[in-house]
Amino acid sequence: MKRTYQPSKRKRKKVHGFRTRMSTKNGRRVLASRRRKGRKVLSA
């Protein structure tokens, strides 16, 4: 059976990257909540 996680740098950036997060209102909300929580890493 194929595993669910098939790593790809391109996909990772496209789906979870900082610029992608910044491009939508909800994405900015995600970053804001992670800043508020004090995450060391905000996005992939």
UniProtKB/Swiss-Prot annotation:
Record flagged with keyword Ribonucleoprotein: yes
Annotated region (Disordered), positions in chain: 1-44
Entry's Gene Ontology molecular function annotations: structural constituent of ribosome
A Pfam family matched in the record: Ribosomal_L34
Keyword tags: Ribonucleoprotein, Ribosomal protein
Superkingdom of source: Bacteria
Ribonucleoprotein as UniProt keyword: yes
Matches recorded under InterPro entries: Ribosomal_bL34, Ribosomal_bL34_CS
GO biological process, one term: translation
Gene3D superfamilies associated with the record: 1.10.287.3980
Bias-annotated ranges (Basic residues): 1-19, 26-44
GO cellular component, one term: ribonucleoprotein complex
Entry's family note: Belongs to the bacterial ribosomal protein bL34 family.
PANTHER family, per the entry: LARGE RIBOSOMAL SUBUNIT PROTEIN BL34M, MITOCHONDRIAL RIBOSOMAL PROTEIN 34 FAMILY MEMBER
Protein name: Large ribosomal subunit protein bL34
